[in-house]
A protein has these predicted regions:
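Alpha/beta-hydrolase superfamily serine-hydrolase fold, recognizing
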Residues: 2-203
């Protein structure tokens, strides 16, 4: 760093289907590339997992980390206007949730979002229905959403819990993502990007 508030700040959220994972996973994530290529400062929150605490614990923990970054730009050496959010799998879903929360609460003007193969939809889409992948599949997906949303009334799942339910994505930051065509999250990722583009957001 050459001075205070001079590099990109990245809130990077680990994956694990909302039920597993740890903040140290950041060391094997795409966030490492952002550090190497751009000298970014990365904050990786250790959010509460759904096995212990269901929604909204994880989303609020990650949002709190975002607010921490905003309030500590000088100590972190990051630019207030260059805070981005990213994550993989459930971390990608939480990335989208945090972007919605920041917009609605008018708290942080997030510069960019990078939800990679994000877990966005608690309802089966074409790619998550009858998926028999080894790492993640329909059965694991159902269990994870059941644990994450327990206590949330059926039919009243908020967009902060499952961002695919968001009716309005206007005002969200530009986005970059990727997803494999055999992954359970393939269709919901495409739908999210299509929704952003329809709202005039570069994605």
């Amino acid at each position: 760093k050459t001075g205070a508030e001079n590099v990109v700040g990245v809130l990077w959220i680990h994956g694990g289907g909302y039920i597993a994972g740890m903040k140290e996973m950041v060391h094997a994530s795409r966030a490492v590339d952002l550090v190497k290529k751009f000298g970014a400062v990365v904050v990786s929150p250790g959010y509460r997992l759904a096995v212990q605490r269901p929604y909204p614990a994880a989303a609020e923990d990650c949002y709190s980390a975002l607010i921490y970054m905003k309030n500590h730009v000088r100590e972190l050496g990051i630019r207030r206007d260059q805070i981005m959010v990213g994550g993989e799998s459930a971390g990608g879903g939480l990335c989208a949730a945090v972007c919605l929360m920041a917009r609605d609460r008018a708290s942080v003007n997030i510069a960019f979002q990078m939800p990679l193969y994000p877990m966005l939809n608690d309802r089966d889409a074409e790619s998550s229905r009858d998926n028999h992948g080894q790492v993640w599949n329909t059965r694991k997906n159902h269990i994870a959403w059941m644990l994450y949303l327990r206590g949330t009334p059926k039919g009243h799942v908020p967009a902060y819990a499952a961002p695919a339910r968001a009716q309005d994505v206007s005002g969200l930051p530009p986005a970059y993502t990727f997803v494999g065509d055999g992954e359970p999250f393939y269709v919901e990722t495409l739908h999210y990007i299509e929704a952003l583009k329809s709202a005039g957001i570069p994605a």
